[in-house]
Design a protein with these regions (language model features):
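Ribonuclease/tRNase effector modules and their secretory precursors
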Residues: 18-19, 37, 65, 83, ...
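Short glycine-/acidic-enriched loop or helix-start segments at secondary-structure transitions
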Residues: 14-15, 36, 60-62, 83, ...
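Short, hinge-like loop/turn segments at secondary-structure boundaries
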Residues: 42-44, 67-71
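Acidic, metal-binding active-site segment of PIN/NYN-like and related structure-specific nucleases
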Residues: 43-61
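N-terminal first-folded block
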Residues: 2-48
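Metal-dependent nucleic-acid phosphoesterase active-site entry motif
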Residues: 1-13, 106-119
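C-terminal structural segments of small proteins and small subunits
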Residues: 71-113
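Short beta->alpha connector loops at strand-helix junctions that form conserved
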Residues: 28, 54, 74-75
Length: 119
């Protein structure tokens, strides 16, 4: 699956997810942070699921109907576990993400919000 990792996601997650067969771009490799709205736009344009720790992306998608290609928000996981958790969500919820779902993942809990604004 094509992914765009937000700068707040541990940089080591890029290599781990790439090794698992995903096509991964990490915004931390860029010379500057384009900001939330532009980052979500890039993910939508490139049809990449955005992976973040930041709840602002959900607000952009839900309240402001900013188009996206799916969002995974990781809450409460140590940096070194982010890729593992993301990989489990990608494997278990591929159809939902392909349909533009916003998935919030916390230890012991997964919340899925289908999106009508998917790219």
């Amino acid at each position: 699956m094509k992914l765009l990792l937000d700068t707040c996601v541990w940089g080591g997650a890029k290599a781990q997810l790439t090794s698992a067969g995903h096509e991964v771009v990490w915004a931390g490799d860029w010379s500057e942070d384009p900001g939330d709205q532009k980052l979500l736009g890039i993910a939508a344009r490139e049809v990449r699921v955005l992976v973040t720790l930041d709840k602002d992306f959900g607000e952009l998608a839900v309240l402001y109907n900013v188009p996206h290609a799916g969002i995974i928000r990781l809450v409460g996981f140590r940096s070194v576990r982010q890729a593992e958790v993301c990989g489990r969500i990608l494997a278990g919820y591929e159809k939902e993400l392909a349909a533009g779902a916003l998935i919030t993942v916390e230890p012991g809990r997964v919340r899925i919000r289908p999106s009508s604004s998917a790219a």
